[in-house]
Amino acid sequence: MNILQEPIDFLKKDELKNIDLSQMDKKERYKIWKRIPKCELHCHLDLCFSADFFLSCVRKYNLQPNLSDEEVLDYYLFAKGGKSLGEFVEKAIRVADIFQDYEMIEDLAKHAVFNKYKEGVVLMEFRYSPTFVAFKHNLDIELIHQAIVKGIKEVVELLDHKIDVTLLCIGDTGHRAADIKASADFCLKHKADFVGFDHGGHEVDLKPYKEIFDYVKEGGMHLTVHAGEDVTLPNLNTLYSAIQVLKVERIGHGIRVSESQELIDMVKENNILLEVCPISNVLLKNAKSFDTHPIRKLYDAGVKVSVSSDDPGMFLTNINDDYEKLYTHLHFTLEDFMKMNEWALEKSFIGCDIKEKIKKLYF
């Protein structure tokens, strides 16, 4: 890994008024997106990789030997989109084929942190599911966690803490090894490394799991859950339960809040931030198009939103692609993006000392 990189000249607020994006081509705009000091709150570490990294793993373990590189990417990944969140989850389970040993998992963590640094991310909250990483090859979740923490720390230190990284633990439903209570226990056992707890997999009403979420919250964890993402669900119960029953501080995706003025008012009254992932929403058919993505309505209504990449390995994207889509389709400005990142910093679960450092440096 080539750690040596030119330092990023991050934008300051007083520079924004002098930048005219309308006079720039796409390549020039991407240079600007990179210079935005980004605080990313919603990215699955276990699905954060480049095409080259993924293909190297597939070839190393001799997976799908009869497929070309392009066919491998089509078989495993979701870069061309699909029919639904359910189809995406099934493909993500295929990707778990590559989680075969702890060295690979450590390399994945290093790769993910370094790529986020190159994208101009200054605060990164990664989340991962111990049971998801472990289940295909019966790995030990303790050794998985050690590998991830070691990989993250090594790159953060090599980069002289120019990016700060923390972890959230996901408790899954939806695959054969899913055990949300065991994940909650694991999260609290490693509270020195985790700052929050999430639910992943198929979107479900989490009211029956209230005791588990209360348990991790009482143990010192912050709460965010995936809710209001899946448009195939017949109602908005997942959102109501997240807000009223689990009393979360943030919501992963949450774009269906836009369907209810009552929910818009509730998230504002409770100071809940929505971790919005625009490209993910469109590729999974949870938003009809970028032009009609609900983030515009939510932002204009005064709801706190942030921009995240969700599963960049599955989509073969990076966070700057999301910024490009929001600019070209919904006309968000640099001032809007800076505000979203300030909100993300405010609502981050990382320690107050790091938040204060980032605020002084970039905002």
Curated annotation (Swiss-Prot):
Pathway listed: Purine metabolism; purine nucleoside salvage
Gene Ontology biological process terms in this record: adenosine catabolic process; hypoxanthine salvage; inosine biosynthetic process; negative regulation of adenosine receptor signaling pathway; purine ribonucleoside monophosphate biosynthetic process; purine ribonucleoside salvage
Cofactor comment: Binds 1 zinc ion per subunit.
Catalytic reactions on record: adenosine + H2O + H(+) = inosine + NH4(+); S-methyl-5'-thioadenosine + H2O + H(+) = S-methyl-5'-thioinosine + NH4(+)
Site positions for Important for substrate specificity for S-methyl-5'-thioadenosine: D172
Enzyme class, spelled out: hydrolase
Cofactor(s) named in the record: Zn(2+)
Keywords for this protein: Hydrolase, Metal-binding, Purine salvage, Zinc
Gene3D superfamilies assigned: Metal-dependent hydrolases
Protein activity control: Inhibited by coformycin and methylthiocoformycin (MT-coformycin).
Job description of the protein: Catalyzes the hydrolytic deamination of adenosine to produce inosine. Unlike mammalian adenosine deaminases, also catalyzes the deamination of 5'-methylthioadenosine (MTA), a by-product of polyamine biosynthesis, to produce 5'-methylthioinosine (MTI). Plays an essential role in the purine salvage pathway which allows the parasite to use host cell purines for the synthesis of nucleic acids.
The protein's name in its UniProt record: Adenosine deaminase
Species this protein is from: Plasmodium knowlesi
